[in-house]
Amino acid sequence: MQEQYNPQKIESKIQRYWEENKVFKVTEDESKEKYYCLSMFPYPSGRLHMGHVRNYTIGDVVSRFQRLKGKNVMQPMGWDAFGLPAENAAIKNKTAPAKWTYENIDYMRTQLKQLGFGYDWDREIATCHPEYYKWEQWFFTKLYEKGLVYKKMSTVNWDPVDQTVLANEQVIDGRGWRSGAVVEQKEIPQWFIKITDYAQELLDDLDKLEDWPEQVKTMQRNWIGRSEGCDIEFKRTDNNETFSVYTTRPDTFMGVTYVAVAAGHPIAKEAAKNSDSVALFVEECKNNKVSEADMATMEKKGIATGFFATHPLTGEQVPIWIANFVLMHYGSGAVMAVPAHDQRDFEFATAYGLDIKQVIAPVTGSDLEVNLNKEAFTDKGVLVNSGEFDGLDFDAAFNAIADKLEALGVGERKVNFRLRDWGVSRQRYWGSPIPMLSDEDGNELAATDDMLPVRLPEDVVMNGVTSPIKADPNWAKTTMNGAPAFHETDTFDTFMESSWYYARYCSPRHDEGMLDPAAANYWLPVNQYIGGIEHAILHLLYSRFFHKLLRDFGLVDSDEPFDRLLCQGMVLAETFYRKDEKGADIWISPSDVNTETDDKGRVTKAWHKVDGNPVFSSGMSKMSKSKNNGIDPQHVIAQYGADTVRLFMMFTAPPEQTLEWSDAGVEGAHRFLKRVWKYAVDVKTVGFQPLNKTALNNEQKVLRRDLHKAIAKVSDDVERRQTFNTAIAAIMELSNKLLKAPLNSKQDVAIANEALEAMLIMLAPITPHLSHQLWQELGKEGDIVNASWPEVDQSALVEDEKLIIIQVNGKLRAKLTVAADATKEQVEALAFEQASVTKYTDGVTVRKVIYVPGKLLNVVAN
């Protein structure tokens, strides 16, 4: 056995052993409880970063722990391989996206193996493989047949440089998040899936997800955005044409003083034909900031159309305005404006001199005040200036006004959702072709099963402008039912692939269907899912939706895909910079910088390793290419080993919080593993002795009690609380006690044997290479990965004696060791035998004695 811990000598050897013996290969086994642990699969960008390492280390720790608990554990890995970065890299490197992607996959797979992750590599998938996207295409055609897919013209955010549609969240300050180009509003035909048909179920079933972070569930609830209100019809005064608005506040309806429509609304388009100034404003709105955060903070602008509408209940004429804060793809593209009771409407009305009419007053006795010279009164209250509805509270007014609108045939109660149908068309090349066609007359046709997969050609040349399948007229040409037909040249949104990959892992080589139902129903739902909170809405919502679709097609028998969700925090690192001659920041890698720090680890001085000149610290920020502060996992593994990296990742912060990279912290983790190794050498040297619980002295009982307390804490911290950092702290505390304990008597050695075995198993999920090697060195049977998690010996936790704190008037005066079953009277008698106690009680009156059993006795005297 090596005297010193040397990870470079053992880790690659152990990884080969795991691979050659398929240690992590798993199949369905009805005799065992299953456990499916999944970390969000990576985009094959070329190299793993520390964010990946943290995510996958957490998943591996959970997986290995559950295996040690006796469960049949599946932990797969694959690649979210389609997407725009591959196209950009292909253009830059003059290669095909497929070639670039497959090379990256090969490299990153090697990196994952070097970190010792226990994946069943026989289940590996890549979403760019036709064998994968074939079934996605098949499912899309079935959704089309069921009426859950449709095509329509849609106003989209168009990036003129990347030539693709952007989600609202991908538009930053009116520009494309990747290209930086000014985003345009453009109408193009797009395919949609009717996620809105499942909106209520998606909302309701959030209540079933008891082991999801509340923050994620709240974000999804807000995104789905269920509201109860009224659809109300307004009639134009010039041509009697009607248009509808939706409101959640019908109680304010009598206070409508204008109506606002989106720039894309038919009324706005008509007005633009009549007025150059209106046309100019409508064009300006096309370049609006369109994310919701931007909409909330941007300046509210508008222009009058010159048209008016009739208020359905008062008969008053109200002007119709075009406003930049009304979006065509939300609701009907028109809103009723009540400036007295909506702050946005108030700001707009104030800016343009529009009427403000109060129709809600505070409830009698309320301390709320109304000051319409300053701001809108947005609270609920009682109606005023509302004719027959005066005096009604919110609920009564809601129903009374809704009843009247319905009776007059100009409105109806309606449940509305903010959620919109999922637009899955993308105008890029590197994605799954959408399995739809059109005939010469433009009629829609779904690809038949024998046409699938509709293959994406991989040997292509990227020109940086047009998708190769759009540029090649021959690619789209085919025949269907003996007649000419043309393939759709748009590709799927890559969220399509990531919305069902978790299910395909259950039967990745199944070629007779999308899923093998028996395998899917054995493994699903995923017991533990791990990934960043940035996926809280789109990916996690689409996956939940897809799972319900799979259920309704009889492919799975559960309602939700992921039982438990853990969202890990970001990895931060110190950032360093210099100024160039123009005053711009030049970011310098932390690996090129020497530093001095204060006692709290804060950088006080920094200089470049090469030239010795000073550099400046900009503090901690997320590891990124833009700030050049990423730490290459390969460098750290080469220096310290994978187990050190894993231990640092799990120990430095709770999993859901940000983790600050620290070279000193990495060194500390490495020192701990060296101490564990040394302890194992010492224990092996003294040999094995059987444990005799009846022969233990008091010190040995205390040490064994500490061991089993640690087992209990680590078990709970890892399984229930998922506070892996505190679990590791408990193991470290135990190891310190073990290292100080003597190895002289037989029972000293017996306890050391028991403790070392338990400690190696508890460390095995976190530092699997070290635990595997020491397990073998100690001559233990089998592989540690197949060992059983240590059980708590309850008898070891029973204390013969207790340490009791003695206080007088709340101040510590003595500490007494008493029998564990000592009564209050016995402890009190012993306390009053102590001179350090009687010094403060003699000559005064003892008012009462308070006893907290097994912990504290406080004498109150004066």
Swiss-Prot record:
GO molecular function: aminoacyl-tRNA deacylase activity; ATP binding; leucine-tRNA ligase activity
Subcellular location per the Swiss-Prot or TrEMBL entry: Cytoplasm
GO annotation terms (biological process): leucyl-tRNA aminoacylation
Residue numbers covered by motif 'KMSKS' region: 622-626
Reactions it catalyzes: tRNA(Leu) + L-leucine + ATP = L-leucyl-tRNA(Leu) + AMP + diphosphate
Keyword Protein biosynthesis appears in the UniProt entry: yes
PROSITE patterns attached to this UniProt entry: AA_TRNA_LIGASE_I (PS00178)
Keywords from the named record: Aminoacyl-tRNA synthetase, ATP-binding, Cytoplasm, Ligase, Nucleotide-binding, Protein biosynthesis
Taxonomic superkingdom: Bacteria
Binding-site residues for ATP, renumbered to this chain: 625
Parts of the chain that traverse the membrane: none
Any GO CC annotation of this UniProt entry: cytosol
Pfam families: Anticodon_1 (PF08264), tRNA-synt_1 (PF00133), tRNA-synt_1_2 (PF13603), tRNA-synt_1g (PF09334)
Chain positions of motif 'HIGH' region: 42-52
Alphabetized Gene3D superfamilies for the sequence: 2.20.28.290, 3.10.20.590, HUPs (3.40.50.620), Isoleucyl-tRNA Synthetase, Domain 1 (1.10.730.10)
Annotated EC: 6.1.1.4
HAMAP family in the record: Leu_tRNA_synth_B
PANTHER family: LEUCINE--TRNA LIGASE, MITOCHONDRIAL, LEUCYL-TRNA SYNTHETASE
Family assignment from sequence similarity: Belongs to the class-I aminoacyl-tRNA synthetase family.
Protein name per its UniProtKB record: Leucine--tRNA ligase
Organism: Pseudoalteromonas translucida (strain TAC 125)
